[in-house]
């Protein structure tokens, strides 16, 4: 008798994706982040669902409803902080996952990579709208500042902003629609993640060497299921350390003050995972220029496969490219730090230099480094 997991229409899909999947025998822990992102997504949907049961998307009661969740709902505080810090864990895993893709040349799987970029944009949109929902000071002013950026679009900008707001300022209509979109987007992300996986399984996984591994494959289960469980345990350990010991470490104290349209906080800044893009936005004195740089800082990922000039796929055996990659990582950390600093000397010039470096490394230095390596190897 044939095993049911290989014949049942639904079980067959699961089997081919998670059990009998032929996997390269040498993939490292950097390949764990895909499954960790899946765990983060499930965790966010579950905690978010329970939060939505008690949350009210009205400007008068939103802040109070979050307070009510933390004080009066059974285990409401842990659900709320798991959701808030879960978003941070989600982005840590996302950045690691993208970094892995850049380092090992996984971006040569074009469809998988491009859907990944769409997933990143959808996740960023979801996180932004989620940050608005508690209706604290930073929620309100963050929403005002970021949505206002669309007014930089020539001719239709102002109308577009008012259309998104549902009025002439961020108000009740804005909060209600942000809640609706924040609720629906994770399910769209789930569907996109399935398509992401579908395209990945068409080609099979990449591996650290970047060399095709068709001759050396092992089944996903038990080898990588156990490895993923270890990764998941570490993820949950770090998340729960954050939630139970320093739940507000990554948040902004201003968000414990109810939203007040008449009082602007001294430093408006987004959550830490958007600071690098925020620093790039602020480093350009022109509004439209800043918005374009902000959008390009993410969409530049789409260009990466076309900027690949090396004869090798992975950076494993390319020391000059490795240097460029780690300079890029340092540059992104610098931008993240600058994004959280006030707009004054010397932060302005550091931010501008780091922003120029960011685009220069990806568009010029990395392709040049690859060409130099090709010549050194006489390829």
From Swiss-Prot:
Binding site for heme b b562: 83, 182
Annotated positions binding heme b b566: 97, 196
Predominant cellular place of this UniProt entry's protein: mitochondrion
Cofactor(s) in the UniProt record: heme b
GO biological process, one term: mitochondrial electron transport, ubiquinol to cytochrome c
Positions of transmembrane segments: 33-53, 77-98, 113-133, 178-198, 226-246, 288-308, 320-340, 347-367
Single GO molecular function: metal ion binding
Secretion signal, residue range per the UniProt entry: none
Cofactor binding comment, as recorded: Binds 2 heme b groups non-covalently.
Pfam families in alphabetical order: Cytochrom_B_C, Cytochrome_B
Binding site residues for a ubiquinone: 201
GO cellular component assignments: mitochondrial inner membrane; respiratory chain complex III
Keywords of this entry: Electron transport, Heme, Iron, Membrane, Metal-binding, Mitochondrion, Mitochondrion inner membrane, Respiratory chain, Transmembrane, Transmembrane helix, Transport, Ubiquinone
Membrane topology, from the record: Multi-pass membrane protein
Compartment list: Mitochondrion inner membrane
Domain of life: Eukaryota
Keyword Metal-binding in annotation: yes
SUPFAM superfamilies xref list: a domain/subunit of cytochrome bc1 complex (Ubiquinol-cytochrome c reductase), Transmembrane di-heme cytochromes
Nucleotide-binding listed as a keyword: no
UniProt function note: Component of the ubiquinol-cytochrome c reductase complex (complex III or cytochrome b-c1 complex) that is part of the mitochondrial respiratory chain. The b-c1 complex mediates electron transfer from ubiquinol to cytochrome c. Contributes to the generation of a proton gradient across the mitochondrial membrane that is then used for ATP synthesis.
UniProt subunit comment: The cytochrome bc1 complex contains 11 subunits: 3 respiratory subunits (MT-CYB, CYC1 and UQCRFS1), 2 core proteins (UQCRC1 and UQCRC2) and 6 low-molecular weight proteins (UQCRH/QCR6, UQCRB/QCR7, UQCRQ/QCR8, UQCR10/QCR9, UQCR11/QCR10 and a cleavage product of UQCRFS1). This cytochrome bc1 complex then forms a dimer.
Family: Belongs to the cytochrome b family.
Note in the entry: Heme 1 (or BL or b562) is low-potential and absorbs at about 562 nm, and heme 2 (or BH or b566) is high-potential and absorbs at about 566 nm.
Name this polypeptide is given: Cytochrome b
């Amino acid at each position: 008798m044939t095993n049911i997991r290989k014949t049942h229409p639904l079980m067959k899909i699961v089997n081919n994706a998670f059990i009998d999947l032929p996997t390269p025998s040498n993939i490292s822990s950097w390949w764990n982040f895909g499954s960790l992102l899946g765990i983060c997504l499930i965790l966010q949907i579950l905690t978010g669902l329970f939060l939505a049961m008690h949350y009210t998307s009205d400007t008068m009661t939103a802040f109070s409803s979050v307070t009510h969740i933390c004080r009066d709902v059974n285990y409401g505080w842990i659900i709320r902080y798991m959701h808030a810090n879960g978003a941070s864990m989600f982005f840590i895993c996302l950045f690691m996952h993208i970094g892995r893709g850049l380092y090992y040349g996984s971006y040569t799987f074009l469809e998988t990579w491009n859907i990944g970029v769409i997933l990143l944009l959808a996740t960023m949109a979801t996180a932004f709208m989620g940050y608005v929902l508690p209706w604290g000071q930073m929620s309100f002013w963050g929403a005002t500042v970021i949505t206002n950026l669309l007014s930089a679009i020539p001719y239709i900008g102002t109308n577009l902003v008012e259309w998104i707001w549902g009025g002439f300022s961020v108000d009740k209509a804005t909060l209600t629609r942000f809640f609706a979109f924040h609720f629906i987007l994770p399910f769209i992300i789930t569907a996109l993640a399935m398509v992401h996986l579908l395209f990945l399984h068409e080609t099979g996984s990449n591996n650290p060497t970047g060399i095709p591994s068709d001759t050396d494959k092992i089944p996903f289960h038990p080898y990588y299921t156990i490895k993923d469980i270890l990764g998941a345990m570490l993820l949950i350990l770090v998340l729960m350390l954050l939630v139970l010991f320093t739940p507000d470490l990554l948040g902004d104290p201003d968000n414990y003050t109810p939203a007040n349209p008449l009082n602007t906080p001294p430093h408006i800044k987004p959550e830490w995972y958007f600071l690098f893009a925020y620093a790039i936005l602020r480093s350009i004195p022109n509004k439209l220029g800043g918005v374009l740089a902000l959008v390009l800082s993410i969409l530049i990922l789409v260009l990466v496969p076309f900027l690949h000039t090396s004869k090798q796929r992975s950076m494993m055996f390319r020391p000059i490219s490795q240097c460029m990659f780690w300079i890029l990582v340092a540059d992104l950390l610098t931008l993240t730090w600058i994004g959280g600093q006030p707009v004054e000397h010397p932060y302005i010039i550091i931010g501008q230099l780091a922003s120029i470096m960011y685009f220069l490394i990806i568009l010029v230095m990395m392709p040049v480094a690859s060409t130099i390596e090709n010549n050194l190897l006489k390829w």
